[in-house]
Regions:
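Acidic/histidine-enriched, glycine/proline-rich intrinsically disordered or flexible terminal extensions
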Residues: 134-160
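Short, P/G- and charge-enriched loop/turn segments at secondary-structure junctions
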Residues: 62-64, 98-101
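Binding-site signature for planar aromatic cofactors or substrates
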Residues: 9-13, 56, 82, 94, ...
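A solvent-exposed, acidic/Ser-Thr-rich amphipathic alpha-helical stretch
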Residues: 28-92
Length: 160
């Protein structure tokens, strides 16, 4: 692998991680900055549209969640000059707001296309493939015990 391709993979991994951070912290300006202006996001039957439309949609969709943890597992990148493709296995945890909190866990894959323009990698196309999902009530007693003495995360930029 060439040094340029390796640097491309590092930049792409950072891009995917920044996207997850933006979703987790509800930093939708950060999420939007991960996409080229002409990019398309296809969220598996729930949404397909432009980057601006996606950011508006996901911001609204996450209002009902008190916690969102997007995680990326195995990742593969194929870099070809200023274009690349990526496949990422994802594990996404969502917890709805009280009073009847639910835990939604989604396993899937992101199938991405990227372009490097003006030296910057961004999504040109992002598609999610749904592999598995579960939704269960939150175990409130267990939740209270497990997090009793630990700092609690936040869906804002003030997260510890």
């Amino acid at each position: 692998m060439s040094g340029r391709a390796l640097l491309g993979q590092i930049g792409l991994r950072d891009l995917v991680t920044l996207y997850c951070r933006g979703i987790d912290r509800r930093d939708f300006a950060l999420v939007r900055s991960c996409y080229h202006d002409d990019a398309i996001d296809d969220h598996g039957g729930m949404f397909t549209g432009s980057a601006d439309e996606y950011v508006a949609w996901v911001a609204e969709a996450l209002k009902g969640m008190e916690c969102t943890i997007p995680s990326i597992g195995n990742s593969l990148f194929a870099v070809d000059g200023d274009r690349a493709e990526g496949e990422h296995y994802s594990y996404n945890y969502h917890r709805t707001r009280p009073p009847e909190r639910q835990e939604l866990v989604i396993h899937g894959r992101y199938l991405d296309r990227y372009e490097r323009r003006n030296g910057v990698w961004k999504f040109s196309y992002r598609r999610i493939v749904f592999d598995h999902g579960t939704m269960n009530p939150v175990d409130e007693a267990g939740f209270a015990i497990a997090g009793a003495d630990a700092p609690h995360g936040s869906d804002t930029r003030d997260d510890p």
